[in-house]
Regions:
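Active-site and NAD+-binding cores of ADP-ribose-processing enzymes
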Residues: 145
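Intrinsically disordered, low-complexity linker/tail regions enriched
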Residues: 148-150
Length: 158
C-alpha cells in the first residue's frame, strides 16, 4: 500500500526526542489519556520524577502536528469515551481526583479532544469518508457543561 498510516499505540512513555522523530517520519499516535485514571498514583514510583515529567505528552504530540487518536484499550479501562475526554481535558484521574492535575501543559481543549476521538480515528482506519453516518444523543450538551460534568455524560441513543 502506497499510503501507509503507521502509528504507535500506547505512546505514553514517548519522550520529546522520540516525539520529534515520530513527527519527522509521519507516524501517528493512538493514545489512552484514561490510563492516567490508574497510572497517576504509580507513575512517579515506577519511573522516577524525570521520566514522569516526560510521559503522557499527548498534547505535545498534537501541537507538533502528529495525528493523535484516542482509545481506551478496554477492558484495561472503561470504554466510556466521556471519561477519556474528561481525563484529556482535565489531566485528572476519576479514581484518584485528590492527586490533582498530572501535567498542566498537556491539557486538550474540548474541540481537540473530540477531533482525536472522531476525525483522527476515522483517518487512522482509512474511514474518513464514512464519518457522516455516526451520531449519538446524550443527556447533556457537551459544549455547555463544565469539564467536571463531562465524565458524567450519559448516552441516550446511538
Amino acid at each position: 500500500r502506497a499510503n501507509h498510516r503507521h502509528s504507535i499505540i500506547h505512546a505514553q512513555l514517548a519522550n520529546k526526542g522520540q516525539i520529534n522523530r515520530m513527527r519527522e517520519l509521519g507516524i501517528s499516535a493512538i493514545v489512552q489519556p484514561i490510563f492516567l485514571n490508574s497510572d497517576i498514583a504509580i507513575v512517579e514510583k515506577r519511573l522516577g520524577k524525570t521520566r514522569k515529567e516526560e510521559s503522557y505528552l499527548f498534547k505535545t504530540m498534537y501541537d507538533k502536528g502528529i495525528k493523535v487518536g484516542f482509545s481506551t484499550d478496554a477492558p484495561v479501562e472503561l470504554v466510556n469515551p466521556f471519561h477519556n475526554i474528561y481525563t484529556a481535558m482535565s489531566g485528572k484521574s476519576i479514581k484518584n481526583p485528590e492527586l490533582g492535575v498530572f501535567n498542566t501543559n498537556e491539557l486538550f481543549s474540548l474541540e481537540e479532544a473530540l477531533e482525536c476521538y472522531t476525525d483522527t480515528n476515522y483517518w487512522l482506519t482509512y474511514d474518513e469518508h464514512k464519518n457522516y453516518n455516526d451520531y449519538i444523543i446524550v443527556d447533556k450538551d457537551i459544549n455547555n457543561c463544565s469539564i467536571e460534568e463531562i465524565k458524567d455524560i450519559q448516552v441516550l441513543e446511538a
